[in-house]
């Protein structure tokens, strides 16, 4: 296959020309403008310290439609227990560093290298990268970061990047809060990028690249919810009378 080498121009090749593994292009930079252009075209960076910047558009693509989120009964009980507090965009840097430090089965290092951390911090400052923080009580009256996730939001799409947990179910709690908030705000799709058993259990599914790009085109017509996110007053992720009974 021919691997497209990016130039200084903010342009990418057609995602449909990616390799069977999803690899599309090499090089370029991680500027805010290039990253936004990439995500708007269904492309994301993924590499490590031993390689140049690599750009991917896998086929199939793992996505989660917010209305199809499945919350197991045990996780519902965990959320209702009140042992966790959830916030948005209050500790983005701590979340991305925790994701970088998290041990991954079958991986000896991390793809969230320093260059990536700096780039997504810039995206966060630009108001398009967001974090979900899950806190548990620490010693005394303090609290500790128990889990969380971060990703990029454009139009009606949230592109999930990474998550971590230090307490049982903390990352799962972050997923539920995020997806229910996205549904509340009218988002169309969560891009999970790579297929994982973890996300399939939440109701994610695989779709073809072509299907994803069509969905992306529609979703990006929605207005951008830029800036720091906040949880609406009174919002509760499980208090949705219109949702089907997920205990069945």
UniProtKB/Swiss-Prot annotation:
Gene3D superfamilies named among the record's database cross-references: Leucyl/phenylalanyl-tRNA-protein transferase, C-terminal domain, Leucyl/phenylalanyl-tRNA-protein transferase, N-terminal domain
Catalytic activity entry: N-terminal L-lysyl-[protein] + L-leucyl-tRNA(Leu) = N-terminal L-leucyl-L-lysyl-[protein] + tRNA(Leu) + H(+); N-terminal L-arginyl-[protein] + L-leucyl-tRNA(Leu) = N-terminal L-leucyl-L-arginyl-[protein] + tRNA(Leu) + H(+); L-phenylalanyl-tRNA(Phe) + an N-terminal L-alpha-aminoacyl-[protein] = an N-terminal L-phenylalanyl-L-alpha-aminoacyl-[protein] + tRNA(Phe)
GO-annotated cellular components: cytoplasm
Signal peptide interval: none
Record InterPro entries: Acyl_CoA_acyltransferase, Leu/Phe-tRNA_Trfase, Leu/Phe-tRNA_Trfase_C, Leu/Phe-tRNA_Trfase_N
Predominant place of localization: cytoplasm
One GO-annotated biological process of the protein: protein catabolic process
Subcellular location: Cytoplasm
Keyword list, A-Z: Acyltransferase, Cytoplasm, Transferase
GO molecular function ontology, one term from the record: leucyl-tRNA--protein transferase activity
E.C. numbers: 2.3.2.6
Highest taxon above the source species: Bacteria
PANTHER family with a match to the protein in the record: LEUCYL/PHENYLALANYL-TRNA--PROTEIN TRANSFERASE, LEUCYL_PHENYLALANYL-TRNA--PROTEIN TRANSFERASE
Family indicated by similarity: Belongs to the L/F-transferase family.
Function recorded in the entry: Functions in the N-end rule pathway of protein degradation where it conjugates Leu, Phe and, less efficiently, Met from aminoacyl-tRNAs to the N-termini of proteins containing an N-terminal arginine or lysine.
Name this protein carries in UniProt: Leucyl/phenylalanyl-tRNA--protein transferase
Gene coding for it: aat
């Amino acid at each position: 296959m021919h691997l497209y080498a990016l130039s200084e121009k903010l342009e990418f090749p057609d995602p449909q020309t990616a390799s069977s593994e999803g690899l599309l292009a090499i090089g370029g930079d991680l500027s805010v403008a290039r990253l936004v252009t990439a995500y708007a075209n269904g492309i994301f960076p993924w590499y490590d310290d031993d390689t140049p910047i690599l750009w991917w558009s896998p086929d199939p693509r793992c996505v989660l439609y917010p209305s199809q989120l499945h919350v197991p009964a045990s996780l519902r009980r965990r959320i209702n227990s009140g042992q966790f507090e959830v916030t948005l965009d209050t500790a983005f840097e701590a979340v991305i560093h925790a994701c970088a430090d998290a041990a991954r089965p079958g991986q000896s290092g991390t793809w969230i290298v320093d260059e990536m951390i700096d780039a997504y911090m810039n995206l966060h400052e630009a108001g398009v990268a967001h974090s979900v923080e899950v806190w548990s009580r620490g010693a005394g009256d303090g609290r500790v970061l128990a889990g969380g996730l971060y990703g990029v939001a454009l139009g009606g799409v949230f592109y999930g990047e990474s998550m971590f947990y230090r307490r049982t179910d903390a990352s799962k709690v972050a997923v539920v809060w995020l997806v229910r908030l996205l549904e509340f705000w009218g988002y169309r799709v969560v891009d999970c990028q790579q297929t994982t058993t973890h996300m399939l259990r939440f109701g994610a599914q695989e779709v073809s690249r072509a299907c994803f790009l069509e969905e992306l085109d529609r979703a990006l017509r929605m207005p951008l919810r830029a800036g720091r996110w906040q949880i609406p007053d009174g919002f509760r992720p499980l208090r949705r009378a219109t949702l089907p009974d997920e205990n069945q």
